[in-house]
């Protein structure tokens, strides 16, 4: 129940507590309460009844928490995230972030949807209901992301219609197909008219095309990277979500927009398990905002009240009738958490047992050296850049893998329908001197992607990923390190600390093989995404993203 008006008897009890005629279930006493509307801090009690805030003032409760010298703020809300990118399940993710003050997320589960479709989204909703995390969901709008790759499922108009009936589902997730919106593609428009809220995805879109995109219903954007671009989007009525993650960091460029009530701070799912454990989640984003000179209350608004108002979530403010999601801080500027309450209760966490069907998603045929042979001569080469998800294209004369020139072999193995398809290409930028790294995290279709020096290591790494039913594997003739990811082939069923330990082992082994990329796993995961320029590799072959077509390995 997200509104106190949903049940008459509960509403009666809440009103009685608010009047002072009935003891509250729980009271936070003598807190320094942050008023996000008047932008001030005042002292008072917070009375909770039936999971909602009943009143602010002087109250007594059946249970009380003394909060003298503590600052009370609403639980933080991540307005745009992809939990699967952390490689953690929802329950394990919740165990990490809720104690740090993040009590709500609005997730776009398009990663699992590309593997398991509607059933995968429903599984995440089911798991989330077993956690204290307020898990709101936007229906993935572009699954698959492109016809130039093979995904495990499709989310069409009918699936969107069915998912929108779920209580936690708020609207349509980032509409990446902005060309389809602007050109009034019928299927795209059919998806839009079903949804109340439509999140946008419009990098660099300006002028009349931006007008058309917004006129169609896209009401937010998290891809803004410049102040002028953000200012135009705000002027035209859009809400701007400012990313501050592990890789994509736009806060510095966009901090001039942060005083606006139509701006939010988000992670976009771009917080690695290492960074969550060592630095934090939205609490870290808040601290980054403070480091950039943003006022504490303005920063809080962008992480609480603003996303709540945009999505119509009954939270984000310490005020009567709001969900009693309260964070008590020892220090506001440092966001030093003393206590967290969700619905007026301290959160409890438990494990979730995933069904076997969610653990058997890798249906690929094992590869052999014969199946991954590459042409030589004058060829196209994918160029990767450290810390970037865009790639370049080079034309080189090659006679095969050339370690001295850092020209390696890349393969993408289809893993959803057992077609046996293998996309093959040359890639430069990984720096491997020997061995290979393979993984079943490959945005967005999550086929198996691998980069390596020799065929033996490539086959060893890819085939071990298949045996694990998903994961990340480093091989040098034989397996050197591995991280099993059995849930849809993209998430671990282990504790976050163990995931970090295994991931650290993988990165150490990759470094030993010569790679100097800051995040080799992330870089590898994006060379298969055929909607981000320039040259990508899918199971169907080399993709020229700007031309939106498969191209031949050999250059004309």
From Swiss-Prot:
The signal peptide stretch is none
User: Which InterPro entries does the record match to this protein?
Assistant: Adenine_deam (IPR006679), Adenine_deam_C (IPR026912), Amidohydro-rel (IPR006680), Metal-dep_hydrolase_composite (IPR011059), Metal_Hydrolase (IPR032466)
Any coiled-coil ranges, and where?
none
Needed co-factor(s):
Mn(2+)
Q: Which UniProt keywords apply?
A: Hydrolase, Manganese
For this UniProt entry, the molecular function terms from Gene Ontology, in alphabetical order, are: adenine deaminase activity
Concerning Pfam families, the annotation shows: Adenine_deam_C, Amidohydro_1
Q: Name one GO biological process term.
A: adenine catabolic process
Taxonomy, superkingdom = Archaea
Q: Look up the EC number in the record and give it.
A: 3.5.4.2
EC class, as a word, reads: hydrolase
Chemical reaction(s) catalysed: adenine + H2O + H(+) = hypoxanthine + NH4(+)
Entry's family note? Belongs to the metallo-dependent hydrolases superfamily. Adenine deaminase family.
What name appears for this protein in its UniProt entry?
A: Adenine deaminase
Instruction: Quote the gene name from the UniProt entry.
Output: ade
């Amino acid at each position: 129940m997200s509104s106190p008006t949903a049940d008459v008897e509960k509403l009666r009890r809440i009103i009685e507590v608010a009047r002072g005629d009935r003891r509250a279930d729980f009271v936070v006493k003598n807190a320094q309460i942050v008023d996000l509307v008047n932008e001030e801090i005042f002292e008072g009690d917070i009375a909770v009844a039936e999971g909602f805030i009943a009143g602010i003032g002087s109250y007594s409760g059946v249970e009380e928490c003394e909060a003298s010298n503590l600052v009370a703020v609403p639980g933080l809300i991540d307005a745009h995230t992809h939990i699967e990118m952390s490689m953690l399940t929802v329950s394990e993710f919740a165990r990490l972030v809720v104690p740090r003050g993040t009590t709500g997320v609005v997730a776009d589960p398009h990663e699992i949807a590309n593997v398991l479709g509607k059933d995968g989204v429903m599984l995440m909703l089911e798991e989330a209901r077993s956690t204290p995390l307020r898990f709101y969901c936007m229906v993935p709008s572009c699954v698959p992301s492109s016809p130039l790759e093979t995904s495990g499922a499709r989310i069409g108009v009918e699936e969107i219609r069915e998912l929108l009936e779920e209580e936690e589902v708020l609207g349509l997730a980032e509409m990446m197909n902005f060309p389809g919106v602007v050109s009034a593609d019928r299927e795209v428009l059919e998806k839009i008219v079903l949804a109340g809220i439509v999140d946008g995805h419009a990098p660099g879109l300006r002028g009349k095309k931006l007008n058309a995109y917004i006129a169609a219903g896209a009401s937010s954007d998290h891809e803004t990277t410049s102040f002028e671009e953000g200012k135009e989007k705000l002027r035209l009525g859009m809400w701007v979500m400012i990313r501050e993650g592990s890789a994509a960091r736009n806060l510095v460029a966009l901090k001039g927009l942060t005083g606006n009530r139509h701006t939010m701070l988000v992670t976009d799912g771009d917080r690695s398990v290492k960074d969550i454990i060592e630095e934090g989640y939205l609490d870290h984003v808040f601290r980054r905002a403070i480091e950039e000179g943003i006022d504490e209350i303005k920063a809080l608004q962008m992480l609480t009240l603003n996303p709540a108002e945009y999505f119509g979530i009954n939270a984000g403010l310490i005020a009567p009738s709001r969900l009693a999601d309260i964070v008590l801080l020892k220090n506001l500027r440092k966001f030093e958490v003393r206590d967290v309450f969700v619905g007026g209760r301290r959160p409890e966490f438990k494990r979730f047992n995933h069904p076997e069907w969610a653990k058997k998603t890798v249906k690929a045929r094992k590869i052999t050296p014969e199946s991954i042979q590459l042409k030589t001569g004058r060829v196209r080469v994918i160029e990767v850049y450290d810390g970037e998800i865009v790639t370049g294209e080079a034309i080189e004369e090659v006679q095969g893998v050339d370690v001295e020139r850092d020209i390696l072999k890349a393969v993408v193995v289809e893993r959803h329908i057992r077609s046996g398809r293998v996309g093959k290409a040359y890639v430069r930028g990984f720096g491997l001197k020997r061995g290979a790294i393979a993984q079943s995290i490959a945005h967005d279709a999550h086929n198996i992607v691998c980069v390596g020096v020799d065929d033996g290591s490539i086959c060893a790494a890819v085939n071990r990923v298949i045996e694990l039913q998903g994961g990340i594997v480093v091989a040098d003739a034989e397996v050197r390190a591995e991280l099993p990811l059995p849930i849809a082939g993209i998430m671990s069923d282990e504790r976050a600390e163990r995931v970090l330990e295994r991931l650290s082992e993988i990165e150490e082994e990759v470094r030993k093989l010569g790679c100097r990329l800051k995040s080799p796993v992330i870089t590898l995961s994006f060379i298969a995404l055929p909607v981000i320029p320039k040259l990508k590799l899918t199971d169907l072959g080399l993709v020229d993203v700007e031309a939106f077509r498969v191209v031949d390995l050999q250059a004309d």
